[in-house]
Amino acid sequence: MLQSGEGSPTLPKRVFKIIVIGDSDVGKTCLTYRFCTGKFPEKTEATIGVDFRERTLDIDGEQIKLQLWDTAGQERFRKSMVPHYYRNVHAVVFTYDVTKGRSFQGLPSWIEECERYSLNASEIPRILVGNKCDLKDQAEVDTNSATRFADANSMPLFETSAKADSEMGNIEAIFLTVAHKLKSQKPMMKQDYPNMKRATVLSVDKEVLRTNEAPCSC
């Protein structure tokens, strides 16, 4: 059972930090925005540091909060932030653009970076997401290749589109899969909040440096 936190008497006791990583312009911001708001942003600002959103879920009667850290894909923007956003991570969502083969070819370097910070597959749930599947006629990464890569790295694969309204259920399934994997684990962060009727979507200004508005890469 998957629900948003609306109508719940309290916010969850268990909080999980999930980082969404991958090359620049693969649609990480739109993916997290779609999951947290149910909408596709017509415009977004390029993430230079870290953008932060969260959503409260009801998983089998237990309230769980997912904190989604959307990280910059460009190396020159990430160097000073890397130690910070890899701290206390509970799960990783690796993202590539199905229309850009280079973003898929770059996945091993993202996996290596995670392992340098001790985010090993045996300890940290990992998910592989191929975004922009609404542009299948422009695809440079076929499903079979992505499946082989996911299997080799012990990750489930989801192909979806943050832009297509019809894909909302698939996007929910991505994070529901993560939530179920995390539900049975010992929480690393605990919080006690006053009563609050709905989940919130937050942006941490101190962690985010932004450029001017630009069209979103879905």
UniProtKB/Swiss-Prot annotation:
Domain of life the protein comes from: Eukaryota
A biological process from GO: Rab protein signal transduction
Sample GO molecular function, one term: GTP binding
Lipidation (S-geranylgeranyl cysteine): C216, C218
Keyword GTP-binding: yes
Keywords linked to the UniProt accession: Cell membrane, GTP-binding, Lipoprotein, Membrane, Methylation, Nucleotide-binding, Prenylation
Membrane-protein topology: Lipid-anchor
Chain span(s) of sequence motif Effector region: 44-52
Main location: membrane
Coiled coil: none
Keyword Acetylation: no
Cellular component GO terms, alphabetical: endosome; Golgi apparatus; plasma membrane
Binding site for GTP: 22-29, 70-74, 131-134
Cysteine methyl ester PTM sites in chain numbering: C218
Classification via InterPro entries: P-loop_NTPase, Rab33A/B, Small_GTP-bd, Small_GTPase
Family assignment from sequence similarity: Belongs to the small GTPase superfamily. Rab family.
PANTHER family membership: PTHR47978
NCBIfam families according to UniProt: small_GTP
The protein, known as: Putative Ras-related protein Rab-33
